[in-house]
Every structure is written in structure tokens, then in C-alpha cells.
Design a protein with these regions (language model features):
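A structural boundary/capping signal
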Residues: 1-154
Length: 154
């Protein structure tokens, strides 16, 4: 699986403008990602778009959704939803340092806005991410509802 994920970090020729439908590499996305905490009481989920400063700004859910869309699915909504519905990819809720956190699992590997790299579950647990006993798979329907609410509240 590590070799399969390594291809997502290879250079992609052409423009580094990240709106492009073809997606981008993990390195490209990470270079343009900037953490932004949701305002209190507004937990909105988005696949992040470039802002005026040329950055992707969002929190842990936004990072996970955006890596899935831009890096893994290379800009394909069909593949994005297929991977979520078939549980080949999932957003995983965990507790960390006294708060909630979301990481992306794709195959046997995990990534979040702390690691910014594909790592094994044990590596996530070493960071303090507590998956057990209340490991929470965030269902695709929940993802869809949260993203729709994000659009409405936008």
C-alpha cells in the first residue's frame, strides 16, 4: 500500500494552479495548505478551494476531504464518492489531546493535517490519536450532510 500511495507524491507536470480538474500531488497540496480553525459553533466541512492569497485554508475535516478529492481522486467527484461509499476511504473520528479530530484512511494508510504524510495507524496512535474503544467511522451520508450544510452556511 505504501508504494501505491507513493505515486500521489510524484510530480505532476503542468500548472501548479490547484483548481485544475486533474488534481495535484500531496507535496503541492501541503505546500499550499494553511490551518484555519472553524469559528466556535460553526463546524462546516468543505473540499477547500484556493483563497485570495493562493492558499487552501481549513481544519482537520477540510484537510482530509481535500486530500481525498485533489490528491487521491485527482479532482473526480465520482471517484471521491465511490471510495467513501465503498469504504475504500473513510473519515475517521478520534479523540486527541482532549478534543475531537478527523483523519483520512485510504486503504491501510492514514493522513491528517498533523502528519501531512501517509502513515500507519500505529503512527497516528503515537501522536495521541485515540481510535479505541470509540473508533468512529464517519459514514458517507454524514459526510454528504456536513458538506451540504457547509455549502448552505458557506
Amino acid at each position: 500500500m505504501v508504494q501505491a500511495l507513493a505515486k500521489y507524491d510524484l510530480a505532476v507536470s503542468g500548472s501548479t494552479t490547484c483548481h485544475r480538474k486533474t488534481g495535484m500531488t500531496l507535496t503541492e497540496f501541503n505546500r499550499l495548505y494553511d490551518y484555519k480553525y472553524d469559528p466556535k459553533g460553526r463546524d462546516v466541512w468543505f473540499v477547500i478551494k484556493l483563497n485570495e492569497q493562493g492558499l487552501y485554508r481549513g481544519d482537520c475535516e477540510d484537510y482530509s476531504l481535500s486530500v481525498l478529492y485533489y490528491v487521491v481522486c485527482q479532482g473526480s467527484w465520482l471517484k471521491f464518492w465511490w471510495l467513501l461509499v465503498t469504504f475504500q476511504a473513510e473519515l475517521c473520528g478520534c479523540d486527541t489531546k482532549g478534543g475531537g479530530h478527523v483523519v483520512l484512511r485510504y486503504g491501510d494508510m492514514y493522513i491528517d493535517n498533523w502528519t501531512k504524510a501517509w502513515v500507519e495507524r500505529e503512527d497516528m496512535e503515537e501522536l495521541g490519536h485515540d481510535f479505541w474503544p470509540w473508533y468512529k467511522t464517519i459514514l458517507p451520508t454524514t459526510v454528504a450532510i456536513k458538506m451540504a450544510l457547509g455549502k448552505i452556511r458557506g
